[in-house]
């Protein structure tokens, strides 16, 4: 098959060019858009998709996920499926919190005590977030996590190459709490390392890597993240 594709693309023969043109004509054929037909169909499609998503969210995904939680407040809103939960992990969620189902929540498997993920009230946990809990991860009230945020409470592997090759877990000195105080906002793609506390009201710019604790009410960014300016 690869030889045929190569022949069609590179051969100077008339047969190859005709075949190539015919295949492309079939490949890129499109039905004409008829507004009177396709606009209502588009609306109907969206209504069906939304209705099915809400039905499965209410009757299936939300109760299924809540059965895994240690504690869950009122008005919890789960959308786009159900988060993947890995390892031994205690999860507590406050009131009026929203969470994307395309999220991974992971507890350190070698922990002596059960790792704790504590999420406050009115918190947004966005699309493709990963929260790896080594000991404890705390998200205060009104925290906002944009898409692809990574809270790395443990790394998963030791620094020693021999131990790593043997499949040994990370060492205790690589593990730490992560605390996001009230009103913190992490923009898209932010990574927060173990042992970090981010103070109340602080905003971290997209793509930053936070390796050290940040004070309250500042804008921070960069790799590693540094304070850019005070917000108050």
Residue ranges of each PLM-predicted region?
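Domain-scale signature associated with acetyltransferase and cell-envelope carbohydrate enzymes
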Residues: 1-153, 181-182, 200, 216, ...
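Glycine-rich hexapeptide-repeat left-handed beta-helix
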Residues: 139-232
């Amino acid at each position: 098959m690869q030889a045929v594709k190569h022949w069609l693309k590179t051969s100077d023969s008339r047969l190859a060019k005709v075949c190539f043109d015919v295949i492309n004509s079939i490949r890129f054929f499109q039905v004409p858009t008829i507004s009177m037909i396709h606009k209502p169909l588009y609306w109907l499609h969206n209504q069906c998709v939304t209705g099915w998503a809400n039905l499965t969210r209410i009757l299936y995904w939300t109760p299924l996920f809540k059965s895994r939680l240690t504690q869950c407040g009122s008005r919890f809103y789960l959308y786009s499926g159900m988060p993947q939960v890995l390892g031994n992990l205690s999860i507590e969620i406050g009131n009026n919190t929203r969470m994307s189902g395309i999220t991974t929540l992971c507890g350190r498997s070698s922990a002596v005590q059960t790792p704790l993920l504590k999420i406050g009230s009115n918190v947004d946990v966005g699309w493709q977030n990963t929260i790896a809990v080594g000991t404890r991860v705390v998200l205060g009230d009104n925290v906002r996590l944009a898409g692809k945020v990574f809270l790395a409470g443990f790394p998963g592997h030791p620094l020693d190459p021999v131990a790593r090759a043997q499949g040994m877990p990370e060492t205790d000195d690589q593990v730490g709490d992560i605390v996001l105080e009230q009103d913190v906002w992490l923009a898209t793609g932010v990574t927060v390392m173990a042992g970090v506390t981010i103070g109340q009201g602080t905003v971290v710019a997209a793509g930053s890597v936070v390796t050290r604790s940040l004070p309250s009410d500042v804008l921070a960014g960069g790799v590693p993240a540094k304070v850019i300016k005070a917000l108050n």
